[in-house]
Regions:
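Membrane-proximal structural modules of membrane-associated proteins and complexes
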Residues: 1-158
Length: 158
């Protein structure tokens, strides 16, 4: 396969990246590479690198209501939390194509949430485990917090 980038775009790209600073260059395809097209036109996108997420930053929260106890309800709520986290990171400028988190801890948290005492409402949060610049992976942890008026709660551990 051949990736075709207009010369004018390459010239503009060179003008920008020769300036002082750290730059992130993305190549956006105008064709469908997966279909096996022999020639694909693409366009460069360049932007200054900057921090988009700070370590310890709360990225998203949700509440798991007392009556939400089935595996499907818990899974749905956790998926919603992950989606909200990813959306916020994208709005803040992140280019990562997903989130990184410990799958064993995710599964353990899901089991703990399903097995929690009856009538317990819990607040969940997604927190960044490290600083991330525009092109860095987004590493998060999901935490179980005590909701107002509920019994003491725990949190997932990395």
């Amino acid at each position: 396969q051949v990736l075709l980038v207009p010369r004018g775009d390459i010239t503009k790209l060179e003008d920008v990246i020769t300036k002082p600073g750290t730059w992130v260059v993305s190549i956006v395809s105008a064709g469908n590479v997966l279909r096996g097209e022999r020639r694909v036109v693409a366009f460069p996108d360049v932007r200054p690198n900057r921090q988009v997420v700070r370590q310890g930053e709360q990225m998203a929260t949700t509440v798991l209501e007392a009556e939400e106890r089935s595996p499907q309800e818990v899974q749905s709520r956790l998926n919603l939390l992950l989606a909200a986290t990813f959306t916020r990171a994208q709005r803040q400028g992140a280019l990562a194509d997903g989130l990184q988190y410990d799958l064993n801890n995710f599964n353990r948290l899901g089991n703990q949430l399903r097995d929690r005492p009856a009538g317990q409402t819990v607040r969940l949060e997604a927190v960044s485990l490290r600083d991330s610049d525009i092109a860095d992976p987004l590493v998060i942890e999901l935490r179980w917090l005590q909701a107002p008026g509920s019994a003491p709660a725990g949190r997932s551990q990395p």
